Swiss-Prot record:
Effect of mutating residue 28 to Q: Abolishes enzyme activity
Species of the source: Escherichia coli (strain K12)
MF GO annotations: FAD binding; methylenetetrahydrofolate reductase (NAD(P)H) activity; methylenetetrahydrofolate reductase (NADH) activity; protein-folding chaperone binding
Gene this protein is translated from: metF
Protein name (database record): 5,10-methylenetetrahydrofolate reductase
Note: The reaction proceeds via a ping-pong reaction mechanism, and the two chemically and structurally distinct substrates can therefore occupy overlapping binding sites.
């Protein structure tokens, strides 16, 4: 082995050693639509639960059937794994009384952590009657929930400006939110600048970075285009020519995610939220390499 490659290996080992034992993880899942997808979900939950995440969250659909599945999955996770399970709850398609009923049901079933979101506006709809900050207030009135909210390092697509978006986050925190979880991003500097702006605005809760391990670049680009997330040119180049090579795409995506975690860890970030897309393989491998392992 050449001196160059040996030094590269030593640098990588040192970098990973700095992270091991220093980070916490959480995972997001979504309600499956078919029995086959449900089996994949539970296989993923079972595998990732062995990593002892701080919590797992389950997204909340825009229709009653999907909302019911969220409730069922959350309760199943709690009963099956004992993990802290945090349902997403949106206020765009429910009345305050309905939201209170849902919140009380969660509380009575031992669910203490909720991810409070406004939700996506239906096409052609006007100004919403409730915002996420209103939902946080409502939840705190029902019970002393532990509440996570969303944050957008690269600005929410509907925000009038970056400052307006930041003030919206502050309203959610002032209403009682305990932490913010960011939209996924690929430019680490965008997160660090956003964190600095949060501090300057008096937002004193933890800003947990959302990490999306990319195995399908075209799908990730579609997500990014919808959510105002910039894909750096270097990242697009890394996936160039891999449309028909799924295994190499996974390796590339895992390395990008690991590099992001290592850099952010050096900047003092301790908690990371992984968007799993209901697949355990990449998130598990990334966590394993970073030292988050069963029994540790």
């Amino acid at each position: 082995m050449s001196f160059f490659h040996a030094s590269q290996r030593d640098a990588l080992n040192q970098s990973l050693a700095e992270v091991q034992g220093q980070i916490n993880v959480s995972f997001e899942f979504f309600p499956p639509r078919t029995s086959e997808m449900e089996q994949t979900l539970w296989n993923s939950i079972d595998r990732l639960s062995s990593l002892k995440p701080k919590f797992v969250s389950v997204t909340y659909g825009a229709n009653s059937g999907e909302r019911d599945r969220t409730h069922s999955i959350i309760k199943g996770i709690k009963d099956r794994t004992g993990l802290e399970a945090a349902p997403h709850l949106t206020c765009i398609d429910a009345t305050p009384d309905e939201l209170r009923t849902i919140a009380r049901d969660y509380w009575n079933n031992g669910i203490r952590h909720i991810v409070a979101l406004r939700g996506d506006l239906p096409p052609g709809s006007g100004k919403p009657e409730m915002y996420a900050s209103d939902l946080v207030t409502l939840l705190k009135e029902v019970a002393d929930f532990d509440i996570s909210v969303a944050a957008y390092p690269e600005v929410h697509p509907e925000a009038k400006s970056a400052q307006a978006d930041l003030l919206n986050l502050k309203r959610k925190v002032d209403a009682g939110a305990n932490r913010a979880i960011t939209q996924f991003f690929f430019d680490v500097e965008s997160y660090l600048r956003f964190r600095d702006r949060c501090v300057s605005a008096g937002i004193d809760v933890e800003i947990i970075p959302g990490i999306l391990p990319v195995s399908n670049f075209k799908q990730a680009k579609k997500f990014a285009d919808m959510t105002n997330v910039r894909i750096p040119a270097w990242m697009a180049q890394m996936f160039d020519g891999l449309d028909d090579d799924a295994e190499t795409r996974k390796l590339v995506g895992a390395n990008i995610a690991m590099d992001m975690v290592k850099i952010l860890s050096r900047e003092g970030v301790k908690d990371f939220h992984f968007y799993t897309l209901n697949r355990a393989e990449m998130s598990y491998a990334i966590c394993h390499t970073l030292g988050v392992r069963p029994g540790l």
